[in-house]
Amino acid sequence: IELDRDLVVGLKKRFSHQSKFSLREGDVLSAPLEAENGLTINKVVANIPYNITGPLLKRLIGELRKAPENRFETLVLLMQKEVAQRLIALPGTSNFSALSVRIQLLAKCQDVCDVPSKCFQPAPKVDSKVVMIKPFVSSEPDFYEIGNLLEKLLKHAFAGRRKKLRNTIGSFV
């Protein structure tokens, strides 16, 4: 799904002969995620506009309290490096955040490679990173039912970055 009409024309010229390549013009945040030809889309490869990374991730892999509208096996996404580092951050590291917990409860995230800003024309002000995301398949409705509770816990747990966890969640418990 591509919003830029000029890019759509170029992509169609370059990839239209690929039988497994599907391109639709539109806004990825509102366009249907199903294939137009009735086939199942199970992989997504995308260069995400940095300003819609959060909403797009919610749409593609779901939220703690809401299952995604489609189930994708694999997402390979190019995104702003700082956001990607938070997605893949491990507990105890400086990039570990509520976003890290949310995403890692929903999917396995793997660092693929860095992409310096100089690789783009025009060059953005920030570097990028490619991340592979493999969403977990949960058919358990209980998982999504406790999502609101998990969201509240995360809000309290990460409210004071330098505070001890027992102090920040004291009011939660």
Region roles according to the model:
Residues 1-156, 160:
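Catalytic cores of RNA-modifying enzymes
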Residues 171-173:
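Short, intrinsically disordered, charge-balanced linker/junction segments flanking boundaries
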